[in-house]
Structure formats: C-alpha cells, structure tokens
Amino acid sequence: MAVGISPGELRELTEEELTERLRESKEELFNLRFQMATGQLNNNRRLRTVRQEIARVYTVLRERELGLAAGPGEPDGKES
C-alpha cells in the first residue's frame, strides 16, 4: 500500500478501485490498532497516515456523489 497517496492520484481511480482502496486501508488500520494494543507497533505515524488516506478516499467519493468532481471516463464534473 502506498504511503501518503495524493488526492490527485485518488481522483484518477474508478469508484471500484476507490472502494477497494478504502477496504484495504480500513483493514490496515484495524491491524495497526491491534498491534498498538499488544505493544508491537513500531511506527505510530503510520496510524495517522492511514486515517488520512481513508478520509481522502471518502472525500473523493463524496465529491463524485455531489457532482463536484468527475471520475475517470466522465465528461465533466456535473451530472445532467
């Protein structure tokens, strides 16, 4: 999984790819929290990075839902 993916890169992904990225990030966050609880987490910063990535994915999905941004293959950001 890429560390610190940019919103521009996320906007280039399809909705299915975004959903998959969201699922993977949530799974990673769960594993990181489990490691933290058991005292095995070496990189605390990764928790924040994964949470930010999840928020970015949700933001891109919401932009598309509201018609503020176009996904790949769509002519523009507005729905008709």
UniProtKB/Swiss-Prot annotation:
Keywords: Ribonucleoprotein, Ribosomal protein
Cystine connections: none
GO cellular component, as recorded: cytosolic large ribosomal subunit
Single annotated GO MF: structural constituent of ribosome
Pfam families on file: Ribosomal_L29
One GO term of the biological process aspect: translation
Entry keyword Kinase: no
Gene3D superfamilies linked: 1.10.287.310
Entry-linked HAMAP family: Ribosomal_uL29
Sequence similarity: Belongs to the universal ribosomal protein uL29 family.
Name under which the protein is recorded: Large ribosomal subunit protein uL29
Organism: Mycobacterium marinum (strain ATCC BAA-535 / M)
